[in-house]
Amino acid sequence: MGSQDGLVLWFGDSWTIGDGLGKSNGDAGTKWLTNCHWNRNCRPELAFPSIVSSTLSENYRLLGNRGETIQQMGCRLKWYLDEFPVEEETVAYFCFPNYKGRYYYIDNRGNEVRGNPGNAPKHVIEWQDVACKWDATIAINWIYNTCLANGITPRFLQTWRKIELVESINQTSGESWVIPPSECLSDLAFGKGEFGNQYVRCRYRNTHDNHPNQEGQRRLADALLETIAINNV
């Protein structure tokens, strides 16, 4: 994990900024670099990245955004590099979402479509699944190499859905993955595939959406802290 003297950056989607936990009371302060009207009803100070970095006494910044895609995280990284100098020993954590449901493509009419349309033919959906893997791998390669080129140590994990990479073009090193692509943080926190069961839903999820409640965020943080301690990253 990032040293106390270095800076830790957290990139991610709504899970990383405490979506559904109520409007921020300002406790995140200048640490939350992506605070805007789109991120209403979010309490990043109660989300797992803040809990982890606060527990480890780290200097950190939050760059999460609701609905963020892997590709948008790359754009967010580029924005950060354009706007801020890179401090020594900076570590960047990229908390990846579901790469299939967060996939944009242009259809034959020139319209931008997000995700797989439910009424598409089977062969189209199968092709899009393959395209998602390629696009995600290319985007992660870019994030990885851009971090290294700018003196940033990249760290990757999947928050709530495992991902598949195209291994023939994957350029990332094994040590950059805090959690392997075949696993995800929610499985470590709640049990494999258990975030959707009734008990977990009632205890650890917001009643109105699929986001973790405050206790659920605490479990995510504990699972990640344990993983960090075991892997010494």
Indicate where each model-derived feature is located.
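Structural motif
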Residues: 67-79
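Serine-esterase "nucleophile elbow" of acetyl-processing enzymes
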Residues: 1-69, 219
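Alpha-helical cap/lid subdomain in secreted, periplasmic
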Residues: 2, 77-233
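Short, glycine/acidic-rich beta->alpha junctions
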Residues: 44, 73, 138
